[in-house]
A protein has these predicted regions:
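N-terminal secretory signal peptides
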Residues: 1-10, 18-30
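Detector for C-terminal structural segments
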Residues: 21, 28, 378-424, 478, ...
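N-terminal lobe/hinge region of extracytoplasmic solute-binding protein
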Residues: 62-114, 256-257
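Gly/Pro-rich hinge or "lid" segments in bacterial periplasmic/extracellular proteins
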Residues: 98, 186-190, 197-200, 207-209, ...
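Aromatic- and charge-enriched surface segment that lines or borders ligand/interaction sites
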Residues: 108-173, 212, 303-306, 365-371, ...
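Alpha-helical secondary-structure segments
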Residues: 141-147, 208-214, 260, 289-291, ...
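Ligand-site clamp/hinge motif
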Residues: 244-252, 279-328
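Ligand/substrate-recognition segments at binding pockets and active sites
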Residues: 268, 396-397, 431-533, 578, ...
Length: 674
């Protein structure tokens, strides 16, 4: 095991080997400790003055319970909780800088032909795969991208994960997926990249360090597709060694790495330790920490205790902690409160139209209610979420308001207009601006209009046998007091908005995995999930909700609308028809390949249709306050791809950054970006 870098005297690391994160918090409250004073990253010209001349050589950070990594296979996963880890051990063709601009990674350069149908990537020739001990196992060449691409497109290997992006952009990709889907498991598993090439899939490796993709249609955004994990490499020797089942379920002890870090230690639901990859190809081109120590904490309240004792170097603040600080003028952290940039995720209410009880029987009352358009529109037109937003941003809660399904900044038309502004126009809210007082969608609603919509829903549902109040199953991770408080506040929002005779949240808990304990058993009435772009086109958002596509992530995994559409009850037929119309609008927009402006206009109409029919309901943006020794404005900040939590080129300070410094960072960043 690679141990060039030693930790200092007493750290969380020694405690967490023998104790859980909760117990460790109590131990650490008595022992303090601090991070190394050696600078880990240089000052950035765009970020303003640093808090001190000393940076951190070792970073102490965290993740909250219920967000443990579930898959170490970066080709297979579609979850941020996995990418936040695996992006640090495996690189792709392209990465991004702190302004979200694409920068070289495994590809040193790339170009496309005149109509953007052929994209050529020129690979570095100095990249090696290493094992968990930092020992070189193989050299990376273009063949690794052929192996990786065949894996992704093979339905029996990658099980439809991350297939939608190449299927809609690369010649022959969808046909190859369909071919493997129709084969038996053993026959599909035996296929290799040679079979993929023979089938006419539009990827080629003319030499050891060149990869060429041929697109179905002009695709000016294909570099953003290529930045995503669907185009990542896979080491042929490792795939052969582990076999299909073994590689799909690969763990960190088996994984080969080509990224900036290795996993020194992993204790599930407890801790992770990253150390530098000794053979990292870009070691002299970026700054890295000598160690990153990540602990799983039960909630942000525990995190605050750790931060106070310098056992964490950055911490997002819960509403209660922010209140504690701001209500005491003598609190030492008052001048260190830093407002972060929005994350790249747009959070939405995702309904489950095929909800089950714990015994596997249908939750008929919820299923009837959520199939009703007026019922869903109450979420859209009558729900005041400001108290819920305050859970994330107590000082400026309405900065969290989200009115769109697609995240801002994903793509722009030829006039430089953000795509979501086109959606706003279709929704009739393009003239509405942030005022810090009222939610946009409540400005046109009145008490009478909300009451009328509620009555309509109750009358229509009573007529088909639904009973009130409708119980909406909503889950949070057990033992996480912040999530529990969030859920409690959300429940009160429904009460305050509609009374208790209409909708009531039925709060439940899961132990560690939302997917295994809630989503797969279909117990949820709705979830609030965020989606970040995999590439820079609206189809990557709205395409997740359509019918007749096994790659539509939310339609398959959360809303279960595809199951409903197979045999809808009478009360679900109108809902299915709405999804059919939405699907037609999305497919029509996606068929426009020769006029980007027209394409975006068509997608805006499709998205507006989805929102107006509340097939999913926009909820919030994640805009938090934090205490930190890390300059957020030096982190990767891309609207697409998995790279944002890669621990490279971070500017840090031994002293905590102040509110004033962060305001200067923001000004300098915006000035340099414009």
């Amino acid at each position: 095991m690679y141990h060039d870098f030693e930790s200092h005297t007493i750290t969380r690391r020694s405690f967490l080997k023998g104790a859980g994160a909760v117990g460790a918090a109590g131990l650490l409250a008595a022992c303090g400790g601090s991070s190394s004073s050696t600078a880990a990253s240089a000052s950035s010209a765009s970020s303003g003055a640093a808090a001190s001349g000393k940076g951190l050589s070792e970073l102490f950070t965290y993740e909250t319970s219920g967000r443990e990594i579930e898959s170490w296979n970066i080709l297979y996963s579609q979850q941020a909780i996995d990418f936040n880890v695996t992006t640090n051990i495996i690189d792709g063709l392209i990465s991004f800088d702190n302004y979200g601009k694409p920068v070289p990674a495994l590809a040193k350069s790339w170009e496309h032909n005149e109509d953007s149908t052929v994209w050529t990537f020129h690979l570095r020739d100095d990249v090696d795969w290493v094992d968990m001990n930092g020992e070189v196992q193989d050299h990376l060449t273009s063949k690794d991208f052929l192996v990786g691409f065949e894996w992704v497109l093979n339905a029996k290997k990658n099980q439809a994960s991350n297939t939608s992006m190449p299927s809609t952009t690369v010649v022959g990709a969808a046909d190859y997926y369909d071919k493997t889907y129709a084969m038996d498991d053993a026959a599909a598993a035996a296929l290799t990249y040679d079979d993929m090439l023979a089938a006419g899939v539009g990827i080629d490796a003319p030499d050891d360090y060149t990869v060429v993709f041929t697109c179905l249609n002009p695709c000016p955004y294909f570099d953003t597709v290529a930045s995503y994990v669907c185009c990542y490499p896979a080491p042929p020797a490792l795939v052969e060694k582990l076999g299909v089942e073994g590689f799909r379920g690969v763990d960190y002890t088996q994984q080969w790495c080509c990224g900036p870090y290795l996993i020194e230690e992993f204790v599930s639901d407890n801790s992770k330790r990253f150390i530098p990859n000794p053979h990292y190809y870009a070691a002299d081109e970026c700054s890295r920490f000598e160690r990153v120590s990540l602990s799983m904490i039960t909630d942000l309240t525990v995190g605050y205790q750790l931060y106070q004792n310098r056992e964490l170097d950055e911490l997002e603040l819960s509403e209660s902690t922010l209140t504690t600080i701001t209500s005491d003028t003598s609190n030492a952290y008052n001048d260190q409160l830093c407002e972060k940039r929005p994350t790249k995720y747009a959070y939405d209410f995702h309904f489950n139209f095929h909800c089950l009880n714990t015994d596997g029987t249908p939750n008929e009352n919820w299923n009837k209610a959520v199939a009703n358009r007026a019922f869903r529109r109450c979420f859209q037109e009558g729900l005041n979420l400001i108290p819920y937003y305050a859970r994330f941003n107590k000082i400026n809660p309405l900065k969290c308001e989200n009115n769109y399904y697609t995240m801002k900044g994903v793509c722009y038309n030829s006039k430089g207009t953000d795509y979501v502004d086109l959606v706003a126009k279709e929704l009739g809210i393009d003239g509405e601006k942030y005022d810090g007082k009222t939610m946009v969608h409540l400005r046109k609603s009145t008490a009478d209009s909300i009451a009328a919509l509620k009555k309509q829903a109750m009358d229509e549902l009573t007529a088909i046998g639904a009973t009130f109040p409708v119980k909406a199953p909503f889950f949070f991770v057990a033992g996480n007091t912040v999530q529990q408080d969030n859920a409690t506040v959300l429940k009160q929002c429904f009460t305050d908005s509609f009374g208790d005779d209409f909708i009531q949240l039925d709060l439940g808990t899961y132990v560690s995995s939302l997917a295994k304990e809630v989503r797969i058993p279909k117990l949820h009435g709705f979830v609030i999930n965020g989606w970040g772009a995999d590439f820079g086109d609206p189809v990557n958002f709205v395409g997740q909700e359509i019918l007749h596509d096994s790659n539509a992530y939310y339609a398959v995994n959360y809303s279960n609308i595809q199951l409903v559409a197979e045999d809808p009850a009478d009360y679900q037929k109108e809902l299915v028809d709405e999804f059919e119309q939405f699907t037609d609008l999305v497919n029509a927009a996606n068929a426009i390949v020769d006029d980007t402006d027209a394409r975006y206009e068509a997608f805006a109409k499709a998205e507006a249709y989805m929102i107006n029919n509340s097939l999913a309901v926009p909820c919030y943006y994640d805009v938090r306050w934090c205490l930190t020794h890390v300059n957020e404005y030096t982190k990767i900040n891309a609207m697409f791809g998995p790279c944002n939590l890669k621990y490279v080129n971070w500017e840090t300070s031994e002293d905590a950054y102040t509110t004033a410094q962060y305001e200067e960072f923001a000004k300098a960043f915006d000035a340099a970006k414009s």
